[in-house]
From Swiss-Prot:
Belongs to the LamB/PxpA family. Gene3D superfamilies: Glycoside hydrolase/deacetylase. It comes from the Bacteria. GO terms for biological process: carbohydrate metabolic process. It catalyses: 5-oxo-L-proline + ATP + 2 H2O = L-glutamate + ADP + phosphate + H(+). Forms a complex composed of PxpA, PxpB and PxpC. Catalyzes the cleavage of 5-oxoproline to form L-glutamate coupled to the hydrolysis of ATP to ADP and inorganic phosphate. Its EC number is 3.5.2.9. This is 5-oxoprolinase subunit A. Keywords: ATP-binding, Hydrolase, Nucleotide-binding. HAMAP family: PxpA. It comes from Bacillus cereus (strain AH187). SUPFAM superfamilies: Glycoside hydrolase/deacetylase. One of its GO terms (molecular function) is ATP binding.
Amino acid sequence: MTTIDLNCDLGESFGAYKMGNDDEILPFVSSINVACGFHAGDPSVMRQTVEKAMQHNVAIGAHPGFPDLIGFGRRNMNVPASEVYDYVLYQIGALDGFVKAAGGKMHHVKPHGALYNMAATNPEIADAIAKAIYHINPSLLLYGLANSEAFIQAAEKYNITLIQEAFADRTYKQDGTLTSRTEENALIKNEEEAIKQVLQMVKEGYVNSVNGEKVAVQAQTICLHGDGEKAVQFAKRIYRTFEHNGISICAPK
């Protein structure tokens, strides 16, 4: 039986500002990525998100980003790799404290937004992320863009397990990278198209690029975004589509 992980970015509310559909999404995913206060989230939200995830027996990962609350961590920052290391180490440590306090064990690390996209093509950034994981807990898994040589090489260097990730609602360029959110066709808003793309990736191992060419993708985890208008409905549909197609949903080991 084919097995796939469904992950979602949660814990992105901040103070009085609520973001996402965390409670409704949790029953339909197998792992979550919790914002750690730099691009979103705050200490109370982090604690609450961890506790809810444990109630649902969902694998918990840190979702470190650039220190950019206003830009939601989606703007590139020109910082040295040493600072990226500090940012990532700091955020993993913060979330790990909440996970341990709740009696749990952290499962993985997935960079957020611009940090993720930069790491996918910049070996120095990817190396800094992997080094931070290695120094704090080398047993943590690293979620990174499928086929990214930068992620692959960094994980191999520090002997960290890389979980190759694909996206349900994002379009792909010919080189296998994600279409920038600054472009109009970056997001797949039609549910049928998104579900078709997911099944192609999971069952057939490829995705159609924006140019119509087939790009090989061997995904071990699929990211669902939890902050869209139809996010909950979409999560339910993908969950049931996988069940209907005999695809088991489980966090990677």
